[in-house]
């Protein structure tokens, strides 16, 4: 599919490319530090982030690496549930599995031809996917995803880091240096890196003007603005969690009454408070 190949190449080109990549066996022993525009995580720390993402998305189970949600028209694959569309799918979401495969291909990872970034998802719908769940083809896909967790983690981190420029552009000019410093403090620890990744999946980047109640957003940008000071180390993730609680409380307060968003407050708070836990 030429358009998919062009789109995938264009998106991959926007990612920072100086993060270290390694084979699965190297990942266990490589203690070199990744240094990329604020990312200073060792291979061991990145492994913790990857395990937490996998745990968060699918309980850390191998079966959870191949998933298809009820009511959706695409597969969700890998530790971060990258989306793979079958032929003819017309989705508002970004198809990320071909991007992931292109990323791994460019780093010398070998994979079965049918998984290549130019290909559509071979299962046309959820029913076909579930019928094939224990098939040799699906098992091959799961085994590949299980052994490439380090690459998936790098890809997710890079996509998150690529959002930084967008968030800074959306921030008031007078606040950019402070927001940049807070971002860098977060990405220097596995807890902070996970907090940014999870909150982005949870409530977005905060850069979309349409995602506002009474002019106030609730994404990463707003949480970074709400943080107090510029704490370092694990204190950065802890303050990010507290700031997120305040931002989400403001969202509930400003939401249209008919939405009754207060019913979600406890669950939201429980989720962000976990950012304080050591990985």
Per-segment meaning from a language model:
Residues 1-9:
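Bacterial N-terminal signal peptides that target proteins for export
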Residues 2-3, 18, 129:
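Short, solvent-exposed coil/turn linker segments
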Residues 9-18:
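Bacterial N-terminal signal peptides
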Residues 25-29:
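Boundary at the C-terminal end of the N-terminal hydrophobic targeting segment
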Residues 32-279:
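Cell-wall polysaccharide-cleaving catalytic domain and substrate-binding groove, primarily
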């Amino acid at each position: 599919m030429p358009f998919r190949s062009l789109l995938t190449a264009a998106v991959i080109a926007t990612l920072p490319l100086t993060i270290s990549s390694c084979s699965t066996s190297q990942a266990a022993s490589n203690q070199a530090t990744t240094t990329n525009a604020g990312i200073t995580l060792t291979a061991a720390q990145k492994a913790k982030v990857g395990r937490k993402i996998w745990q968060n998305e699918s309980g850390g189970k191998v079966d959870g690496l191949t998933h298809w949600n009820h009511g959706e028209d695409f597969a969700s694959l890998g530790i971060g549930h990258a989306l793979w569309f079958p032929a003819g799918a017309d989705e508002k979401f970004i198809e990320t599995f071909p991007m992931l495969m292109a990323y791994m291909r460019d780093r010398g990872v070998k994979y079965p031809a049918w998984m290549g970034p130019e290909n559509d998802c071979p299962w046309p719908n959820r029913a076909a996917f579930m019928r094939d769940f224990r098939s040799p083809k699906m098992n091959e896909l799961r085994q590949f995803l299980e052994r490439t967790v380090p690459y998936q983690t790098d890809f997710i981190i890079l996509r998150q880091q690529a959002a930084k420029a967008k968030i800074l552009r959306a921030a008031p000019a007078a606040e950019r240096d402070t927001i940049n410093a807070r971002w860098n403090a977060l990405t220097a620890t596995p807890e902070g890196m996970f907090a940014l990744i999870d909150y982005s999946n949870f409530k977005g980047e905060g850069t979309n003007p349409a995602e506002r109640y009474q002019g106030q957003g609730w994404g990463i940008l707003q949480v970074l603005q709400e943080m107090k000071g510029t704490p370092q180390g694990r204190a950065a993730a802890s303050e990010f969690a507290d700031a997120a609680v305040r931002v989400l409380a403001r969202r509930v307060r400003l939401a249209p009454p008919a939405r009754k968003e207060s019913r979600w407050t406890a669950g939201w708070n429980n989720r962000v408070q976990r950012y304080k836990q050591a990985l």
